[in-house]
Amino acid sequence: MQHTLKALGKMDVQFHFNEVLTPALLDTLQEMQDVVCASMDVVRTCLPEAEPDQALMYLESPALVCGVTDGVLDSAFGAKKAALTVDRLAQKLHPSNTRGEEGAVSTRLYTSLDGVSASSQIPCDGIYSKEEAIAEAARCIQCHCDECIKACPYLRHYNKFPRLLTREIYNNVSIIMGDHVMNKPINACSLCGQCKVVCPNGYDMAEVCHLARQNMVETGKMPLAPHEFALMDMMFSNNEAFLARPQVGFDSCKYVFFPGCQMTAIAPATVRAAYQDLCARLDGGVGLILGCCGVIADWAGRTEMFEENQALLQEALEKLGNPTIICACPTCQKTLDGMATTKTVGIWQTLEEIGLPENALDAPRVVALHDSCGARGDADTQDAIRRLAEKLHCEITPTVYDGDASPCCGYGGLTQYANREVAHEMAEMCLSRSDAPYLTYCMACRDRFAREGRESMHILELVYGTSADHCPDISQKRYNRLGLKQQLLSELWEEEFAFMNVPFDIEYTEEAARAMDDRMILKSDVAQVLTLLRETGEAVLDEETGISITRARLGNVTFWVKYKEIDNGYLVVGAYSHRMNIAPRK
């Protein structure tokens, strides 16, 4: 006690001992001080008839702050109310002025009770013993909400709750000078919206990250590098590989088939079969658009580029007579729905109306159905896919996080370009839900799962009895798009379309091909470097290995190619790239 009194004495606290508790004492104190606080024992002794306002901890006459009731929790809460009353009195306000919400309130904290066993209170006789107190305290389940963390590999990877992550993202966006250390986390989010679904309060990290990307692009704070390859791929789809034609024999069409850039890159045979089927069984003409819906630019936060892409598609649709778009990709359908003058429908709904084609695979199998991020919140698409799978005699095994709560495969939001480690963890999360083969209705999901070594198939592969390339590399994907365009132009519209060919042979070792795919170096990039080599002759030869190396600056990237000369061409044994510019000394 003496130690406590001494410590309080250093805080400008005065003590008066042996005072007689009378109303006169309270009057004297009030004349000397702005605010007087008294315990209920003092109030009952001096003013036995007084009844303080328990909500304000205040006695109007005489003006005293008091009224703490019995109990530890009541006393703690009473002290908080009394402190607020003192603050109001010190400001010459009435204690009831602008106090806000006080007392017991309904918490927004959600705590899952999955796996929690019910337990009864430890009985005690008056006071707990040490052992009893420990046992009673051990019953606490440490209430907390981590529903989003459990569901999202992105949040688990950075080990941060959304509130903290949002604050750090805000700081990253707001700083003018200094390092933007949160760029990679901002770009690693798949923007899939799963967190909003699983969060009891609907917190949406996807919206936070998307707005951050848009803001940083607009203010020039977001470098192009993390998304440049994906954006260039989108531009390729809507330039060299782009095709927009009405059905043969029609000037305008009632429908147009839009398979999306991933299906044309991974499963061109499926696109061809689906288009021929739709043309044969739908009246009014079915046009075809091979291209990208533009979501890649939207994911990258490049609003201007996204709007330019929308304008390109709108122009193509107007030339076809503004037909209903039959989409083979839920993300394309969701993106194209945002165009004011378009009407979209999923090919799965169309197949429900016209029935399955004769060559549909009728092979009973057990599958795990992975719902696409693009179909989140779209019950019609999810239900149509399940009915279509049932008609194909697929038995769908239940999985956690399905439907609207389905996780992203790692392609959405361009995660696989910005942070491959997170994208790999996302794919693993998806595949950990079942050991069965995976059935998808998004070709990007099918490709991601195949790259992780899991048997996977797109539902249209079953519908049309076709098979996609197992895991086409980035160069093969571009070749597939061009090849499909060339084939359809020749077969249906009798038009010629020629690839750009180099006048020499280029071969690749298996190691070089794998490294190029991993480093996102296209065979067309290598061809350009070697074409420039033949013009300049600039290369360095390692006489011990016989390997030469040359380089060229293409756009924002410098490519280095290791090669050996062979008959009429080159054998590429390695390649890498960087963003430094190599300039000759002046």
Predicted regions and their residues:
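Iron-sulfur-cluster electron-transfer modules
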Residues: 2-19, 159-342, 480, 485-490
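Structural motif
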Residues: 34-35, 254-256, 323-324, 366, ...
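Ferredoxin-type iron-sulfur electron-transfer modules and their immediate structural context
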Residues: 2-28, 33, 37-188
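Cofactor-cradling patches in redox/metallo enzymes
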Residues: 262-348, 376-390, 397-486
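Short cysteine clusters
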Residues: 140-148, 152, 189-195, 199, ...
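Ribonuclease/tRNase effector modules and their secretory precursors
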Residues: 471-473, 478-479, 483-586
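Iron-sulfur (Fe-S) cluster-binding segments and ferredoxin-like electron-carrier domains
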Residues: 107-122, 149-169, 197-215, 299-304, ...
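Hydrophobic alpha-helical positions that pack around
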Residues: 369
